[in-house]
UniProtKB/Swiss-Prot annotation:
Species this chain originates from: Methanothrix thermoacetophila (strain DSM 6194 / JCM 14653 / NBRC 101360 / PT) (Methanosaeta thermophila)
PANTHER family hit by this protein: CARBAMOYL-PHOSPHATE SYNTHASE [AMMONIA], MITOCHONDRIAL, CARBAMOYLTRANSFERASE FAMILY MEMBER
Pfam families noted in UniProt: CPSase_L_D2, CPSase_L_D3, MGS
Region (Oligomerization domain) location: 400-543
Cellular-component GO terms for this entry: cytoplasm
CC cofactor: Mg(2+); Mn(2+)
Annotated protein name in UniProt: Carbamoyl phosphate synthase large chain
UniProt KW keywords: Amino-acid biosynthesis, Arginine biosynthesis, ATP-binding, Ligase, Magnesium, Manganese, Metal-binding, Nucleotide-binding, Pyrimidine biosynthesis, Repeat
Residues binding Mg(2+) 2: 296, 298
Region (Carboxyphosphate synthetic domain): 1-399
């Protein structure tokens, strides 16, 4: 049936901040849906709280609201915009939950808003564990025996009936949050208590265990005509019992028989029809010896559908959006081939592997075990002609400096350690399989211990055989076969005892070069018009390089802490800029979740690891005019110097555009940067460099404790710490010296209680455009990526702001920056200190762009390609009459055992933005978006160190005046009462009940303010902070943030929150000419 004429305006709900379990895949699907609806002439209103997304760009939708994703706020947007319909299945679990709540509240009915695509009833049947089970039984599809419970007593009863182990699955949660595998009665009670709390409807399903069965997923699509197609089938290398988002996944299925594959395909189609889902949907099965169980259905676009889209080239979100407004599969054109309809099932003639990227390098103390709830932050995808090739490419895409054969880290493992690692799934299991094979374990033994199919273990055995052959010397035949299997020249060089350059030159002299194949949805049966390629060492090459002026942009790889979706945002903007200038733009990247790897984002996409060899291979083929490294985060910046060297070595004319690699090195290399600042006469904190533990002690003593220590060249403050005394320094040196290979340790004076400042600017070598000056709410010493910050600054005097601008201009011009620069400063006792400069895109670029209405990344890309700021009329300075606040989302609730204290190591996974006409309301909105709802009534618990008591008394008085009640520990409550602030005393944890934990567990405490001191109180505080996370109570660990919270609560009690679209705010920006 043709598209509906009554649907003229549609509301799309985004998925909010990047968090574990819900990453960039929803920006990718949301952006695709926006384009798809607007192609059909439908007006799109978008609401999302995450500024770092492409979908919240003003030109992606007709109206963009960056507001908290809570039903009350979305209801106000509906009241204002009056959309005809709402699409729930694009914004992940957040979008589904909000749509369900709006329906329950009667808002949709009141304003006549129809749920388009998958209906609320279908969402409920798929998400409510009990309804889902009944629906499956009704159509005769086998499900594991299970019982849905809503209390711990019911869980005890269910356990008696089903036995242990049990899988606990909460209803309506994200990434398996709150669930797990219970092997004992105690574990069951603990997991059920968390799960019931996390579930929106206070329900969990206890399910008989199918741990060890093969996990298989089908991505299916259905339209209103009841036409169904399967887009892709995927097999998890890891068996059941691990969340599919935590598993290594391969498509097509490798180990099932043709009969089993067809049986599951029929079941998948049967299920999507029975549930009445319209659009894309993901169905998970457990399979063993020819029988199967249906595990769950996601009635929405998901992480797996992003993977399926990228693996096959079939644009699931685009088609889902068109189905939602009434089109059918045979009416929708396949945009990749331009000639086949969307009702043709895609076929693949290659192997695709996805590996998750975990944050354990940042959370050394967190539990690494993988279960049914997610811990990974992102993922990589690789394409090859064989399983081995795809696996090798995927491992190097992870950017963890380790490949299968890397032994350094694993030498100390004993055989018993290896057995334990095979038995317990962790992020290291793949490497444990390699180690076990190297140590002579049989394939059967490894398979029995790990429950992983022998097929996958044999593929790793093949890689080991190839390594052993190479150790016998390099011959043309061996080199050719090793390259076919996915080996890098650098790895081959290690095995044969040559340098990487020698292997590369020998390979090129033999004419062994990669060919590029196209991903075209149809195994080359039809011509594809969207060029999307992967490399392999095969005979025929499908790549036809053009003679146009063209640029290669390096992407940022998998989402991880410290390198998030912000860099993908910048990559996409760079493409737009180049296209506007008539330059062909190509991307190399390997993250299946992002907009940059969408089939129609760039002129050509290379789905490849971002390593020196893989990038050079593409450059050799395409002969670019230039390469851009500024937008791909540290991954790309780290390649700048080696890439320039290799281009010169091979005599290629391609240049690195923008700031020169030498200038990047000056900014990254501490000694060179210090010299530059001294020459410019710009103050910096006292600092020194140490190459040994003894030297470190001497330097720290000269500077005076506390000091900030870190290795040189890092991203996201990895292995950075504030050290208060010599014993702390000794411990750090033991831990950190491992981090820096030939790089020394940097030691800085730690500026206590300074105000931290962040500036994003674009320079063309003559003029400097300052996008914004951000004032941090947390004091210096907390990583800038973890700090809340505000535009414009709220407490800095005018003369300080003038100094900041002056320093930014002088540093940018001295470094001859062409493109973006981010500079971090600290203000203390009347002096502005420069902490660091990064001549690359920063994680605040999207936030600044949304706040002031200037697309900085796009402007920077044009400057790098030769435009000047004056030519673009951008020799200006923006001034805004409102306040924008950026707040971060921390992953602690998904990582049991990690402490929630912030420090110089970056911990956050994503960000949100609050925007209103004063700092209080903007901060209130930002906290609401970050799931830290500030209370307007109830109890506030305060426990602070002595030096904070004077400041906190004033904050506490403001809370009491706002009608909140205060409880505090001994010292703090005494001090508050002495200052005339009423406060009730509660016991410290180790003094028995009633203590603060009892209040938290009873749900009476609505806000916790706890600044830590000594190690004992850090531990005591750890218990308080940890239970705050577990019971979802907002907590604050700095005095500055407590002040901001007080102001926010006062303003929210007095004033109305403004609900306005981004373009309405941007119209109020004034530009001052310079």
């Amino acid at each position: 049936m043709p598209k509906r004429s009554d649907i003229k305006k549609v509301l799309l709900i985004g998925s909010g901040p990047i968090q574990i379990g819900q990453a960039a895949e929803f920006d990718f699907s949301g952006s695709q849906a926006c384009k798809s609806l607007r192609e059909e002439g439908v007006e799109v209103v978008l609401v999302n709280s995450n500024p770092a997304t492409i979908m919240t760009d003003p030109d992606m939708a007709d109206k963009v609201y960056i507001e908290p994703l809570v039903p009350e706020i979305v209801a106000k947007i509906i009241e204002k915009e009056r959309p005809d319909g709402i699409i729930a299945g694009i914004g992940g679990q957040t979008g589904l939950n909000i749509t369900s709540e709006l329906a329950e509240m009667g808002v949709l009915e009141k304003y006549g808003v129809e749920v388009l695509g998958t209906k609320v009833r279908s969402i409920q049947e798929a998400e409510d564990r009990d309804l889902f089970k009944k629906a499956m039984e009704r159509i005769g599809e086998p499900v594991p025996r299970s019982i849905a419970v809503t209390s711990l007593e019911e869980a005890e009863e269910a356990m008696k009936e089903l036995g242990l182990p049990l899988i606990v699955r909460p209803a309506y949660t994200l990434g398996g949050s709150g669930g797990g595998v219970a092997r004992t009665h105690e574990e069951l009670m603990r997991i059920c208590e968390m799960g019931l709390k996390r579930s929106r409807i206070h329900q969990v399903l206890l399910e008989e265990s199918v741990i060890g069965w093969t996990e298989v997923e089908y991505e299916v699509m259905r339209d209103s005509n009841n036409t169904c197609i399967t887009i892709c089938n995927m097999e998890n290398m890891d068996p059941m019992g691990i969340h599919t988002g935590e598993s290594i996944v391969v498509t097509p299925i490798q180990t099932l028989s043709d009969h089993e594959i067809q049986m599951l395909r029929s079941a998948a189609i049967n299920i999507i029809r029975a549930l009445g889902i319209e659009g894309g949907c993901n169905i998970q099965f457990a399979v063993r010896n020819g029988e199967y169980r249906v595990i769950e259905v996601n009635p929405r676009v998901s992480r797996s559908s992003a993977l399926a889209s990228k693996a096959t080239g079939y644009p699931i979100a685009r088609v889902t959006a068109k189905i939602a407004i009434g089109l059918t599969l045979d009416e929708i054109r396949n945009d990749v081939t331009k000639e086949t309809p969307a009702s043709f099932e895609p076929t693949v003639d290659y192997v695709v592997i996805k590996i998750p990227r975990w944050p354990f390098d940042k959370f050394v103390k967190a539990d690494r075990t993988l279960t049914t709830s997610m811990k990974s932050t992102g993922e990589v995808m690789a394409i090859g002609r064989s399983y081995e090739e795809a696996l090798m490419k995927a491992i190097r895409s992870l950017d963890i400096d380790i490949d299968l054969g890397y032994n350094g880290k694993y030498v100390p493992w004993t055989d018993d350690d290896v057995r334990e690692l095979l038995r317990t799934p962790t992020d290291e299991r793949l490497f444990a399989i390699y180690q076990a094979l190297r140590r002579g374990f049989s394939v059967e033994e490894i398979s029995q211990l790990s429950m992983i199919d022998p097929y996958f273990i044999e593929r790793i055995q093949n890689i080991i055989r190839m390594e052993d052959e190479l150790k016998n010397g390099l011959t043309p035949d061996r080199l050719r076969r090793a390259k076919k299997m996915g080996f890098l020249d650098s790895r081959i060089a290690e095995l044969v005892g040559l340098s990487r350059e020698e292997v590369t030159d020998y390979r090129l002299s033999l004419g062994i070069i990669p060919t590029y194949k196209m991903v075209d949805t149809c195994a080359a049966e039809f011509a594809a018009s969207t060029p999307y390629y992967y490399s392999t060492y095969d005979e025929e090459c499908e790549l036809n390089p053009s003679d146009n002026k063209k640029v290669l942009i390096l992407g940022s790889g998998p989402i991880r802490i410290g390198q998030g979706i912000e860099f993908d945002y910048c990559t996409v903007h760079a493409v737009t800029a180049l296209r506007e200038m008539g330059i062909e733009a190509h991307i190399i990247n390997n993250n299946p979740e992002t907009v940059s790897t969408d089939y129609d984002t760039s002129d050509k996409l290379f789905f490849e690891p971002v390593t020196l060899e893989d990038v050079m291979n593409v450059i050799e083929k395409e002969r670019y005019w230039g390469v851009m490294v500024q937008f791909g985060g540290q991954t790309a910046v780290n390649l700048a110097v080696p890439l320039e060297k290799e281009l010169k070595r091979r005599g290629l004319k391609t240049v690195i555009l923008g700031t020169s690699p030498d200038s990047i090195d000056i900014a990254e290399d501490r000694e060179r940067f210090n010299k530059l600042l001294n020459k410019l006469g710009i103050p910096q904190p006292k600092a020194g460099i140490a190459y040994s533990p003894e030297e470190a002690k001497r330097v720290a003593k000269e500077i005076g404790y506390p000091v900030l220590v870190r290795p040189s060249y890092v991203l996201g403050g990895r292995a950075m710490e504030i050290v208060y005394d010599e014993s702390g320094l000794e411990l750090y040196m033991r831990e950190a010296v491992r981090v820096s290979h030939e790089h020394p340790v940097l030691i800085d004076d730690f500026l206590q209680n300074a105000v931290e400042i962040d500036v994003d600017a674009v320079s063309d070598g003559r003029d400097v455009l300052i996008g914004a000056i951000m004032e941090h709410i947390e004091e210096a010493g907390i990583h800038s990526g973890d700090s809340a910050c505000m535009i414009p600054p709220q407490t800095l005097p005018e003369d300080v702001i003038a100094t900041v601008k002056d320093y930014v201009r002088r540093i940018a011009l001295a470094l001859d920056v062409k493109g973006i620069i981010n500079i971090q400063m600290a203000y203390k006792d009347g002096i502005v200190y420069v902490l660091e400069a990064n001549p690359r895109s920063s994680r605040t670029i999207p936030f600044v762009s949304k706040a002031v209405g200037l697309p900085l990344a796009k402007i920077a890309a044009k400057v790098m390609a030769g435009n000047t700021l004056r030519e673009m009329n951008l020799n200006v300075e923006p001034e805004i009459p409102y306040v924008a606040v950026k707040e971060v989302l921390l992953p602690f609730d998904k990582l049991p055992g990690a402490d929630v204290l912030l420090g110089p190591e970056m911990r956050s996974t994503g960000e949100v933005m609050g925007i209103d006409y004063n700092m209080g309301l903007s901060f209130f909105k930002a906290e609401m978006s970050a799931e830290n709802n500030l209370p307007l009534d109830g109890i506030v618990f305060i426990s602070v160190r002595d030096e904070d008591k004077a400041e906190i008394a004033e904050v506490a008085r403001r809370f009491v005046n706002a009608g909140l009640k205060i409880i505090a520990t001994d010292g703090t409550s005494g001090y508050l009462r002495g200052s005339g602030v009423p406060a009730e005393r509660v016991r410290k944890i180790y003094h028995g009940s009633p203590n603060v934990l009892d209040y938290i567990r009873r749900g009476e405490v609505k806000l916790i303010i706890n600044t830590p001191t000594t190690k004992q109180s850090v531990k005591d505080g750890f218990q308080i902070r940890r239970s705050a996370v577990d019971y979802h109570v907002p907590y604050i660990t700095t005095v500055q943030a407590a002040k901001a919270a007080a102001e926010a609560i006062e303003k929210a009690l007095r004033g109305e929150l403004t609900i306005k679209a981004l373009d309405e705010y941007h119209r109020e920006v004034r530009y001052r000419a310079l």
